[in-house]
Structures are given as structure tokens and as C-alpha cells.
């Protein structure tokens, strides 16, 4: 499968099973990113904020996928400040792909996502968990491939978010790619840093 990054928390998973879009953003909702025009078979949105719920930006030809959900919170206060958040667990080409959405809290039961193949996790803080908390999750989950998201990079992203610099300093298995990476059962354990969003 190929994983394409469109910036922020938006990814396209595409391959023999079809195309799934995670957390597409509304036009103008994120500094430095353009309007999305995507095609897919399923759109998964972690919550209903404009930078994660642009279903109308995706032309959908419906297809069924195996998707599990874990309901969490967007903050450390049981959702009282920013609401709820959904972790999506997609089974794709016999691999487990986990998108953490805008998770803003630590959860105890990680059994459904332990040792997943791909983990997409926010690191920018303020609206979500920060780098320290993300690293704690990674240590507990032990994913094969880690993809950080929801951080500031150059002119792209919210000013209040941290960059990925601290996160990179704490990872030893960095693999830099442009905006897409191909993943299969043989892909080695690594942390993927996308250099520039496709959008």
C-alpha cells in the first residue's frame, strides 16, 4: 500500500484494497494548505472540527473495509474543552493501520492497537497530545512504522503547534520521504518524516 500525506492529519491509503482518506480538512482551515480534491472509497474523520471533517472534498465510490473504533477525548478533561475524538483502526492488505486523530489524552487500554503496522500520531501539542506523550504512546504500542502528524512545519500549520524537531531528536530510525511512502509486510521498523505535503 501507499501512504500519501496531504498535510496536517490528512492521509490517503491506497493500493489493492482501494482508497481510504483520513481526516481531510476544509479549505482555509489550515495555514499554508490548499483546498483538497481527492477520490476514494471511504472517508474516516476523527471528529467534527473543520481541519478534520471535509468529507465534501472527496469524491466517494463506496466500498466496505474492516474498520474498528476507539472513542477517546480531544483534551485532558474528558472532552469538556474540545469534545470527543475517534481512533480509527483500518485493516488494509492484512496490515493494521491506526490513525489516532486529535487525541488529547492518555488511555489505558491499548490492546486493540498494540504492535500495529502503521501508527499515525499527533505530536504538536496545544490541541492534542505533545511530543512527550506521543513518545510514551509509541513506547507502549510498539508499532512497526510511526508517522507523526498535526505539527507546524515552516509556513504550514497553526502557530501554537510545536514543530517536529524535538520528536526527531528522540527517534533513531528516521526515514525521510517526500510526500508518499510504500509499505508492505516486509517494510522495516522506522519513523517516517514527510518532507512536504502533497497539497
Residue ranges and their predicted role:
Residues 47, 123, 149-151:
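Short secondary-structure boundary segments
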Residues 40, 118, 134-151:
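Proline-aspartate-enriched helix->loop->beta-strand connector
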Residues 82-83, 130-139, 160-164:
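Charged helix-capping and loop-helix junction motifs
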Residues 144-145, 149-199:
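Accessory terminal helices/loops
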Residues 1-42, 49-118, 126-133, 176-199:
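Core dinuclear metal-dependent hydrolase active-site scaffold
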Amino acid at each position: 500500500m501507499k501512504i500519501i500525506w496531504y498535510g496536517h492529519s490528512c492521509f490517503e491509503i491506497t493500493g489493492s484494497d482501494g482508497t481510504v482518506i483520513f481526516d481531510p480538512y476544509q479549505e482555509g482551515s489550515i495555514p499554508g494548505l490548499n483546498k483538497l480534491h481527492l477520490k476514494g472509497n471511504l472517508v474516516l474523520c476523527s471528529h467534527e472540527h473543520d481541519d478534520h471533517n471535509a468529507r465534501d472534498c472527496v469524491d466517494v465510490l463506496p466500498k466496505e473495509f474492516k474498520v474498528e473504533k476507539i472513542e477517546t477525548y480531544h483534551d485532558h478533561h474528558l472532552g469538556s474543552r474540545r469534545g470527543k475524538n475517534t481512533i480509527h483502526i483500518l485493516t488494509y492488505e492484512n496490515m493494521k493501520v491506526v490513525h489516532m486523530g486529535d487525541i488529547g489524552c492518555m488511555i489505558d487500554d491499548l490492546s486493540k492497537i498494540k504492535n500495529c503496522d502503521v501508527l499515525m500520531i499527533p505530536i504538536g501539542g496545544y490541541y492534542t497530545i505533545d511530543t512527550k506523550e506521543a513518545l510514551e504512546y509509541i513506547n507502549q504500542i510498539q508499532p512497526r512504522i510511526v508517522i507523526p502528524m498535526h505539527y507546524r512545519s515552516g509556513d504550514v500549520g497553526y502557530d501554537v503547534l510545536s514543530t517536529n524537531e524535538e520528536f526527531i531528536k528522540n527517534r533513531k530510525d528516521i526515514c525521510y520521504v517526500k510526500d508518499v511512502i510504500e509499505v508492505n509486510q516486509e517494510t522495516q521498523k522506522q519513523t517516517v518524516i514527510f518532507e512536504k505535503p502533497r497539497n
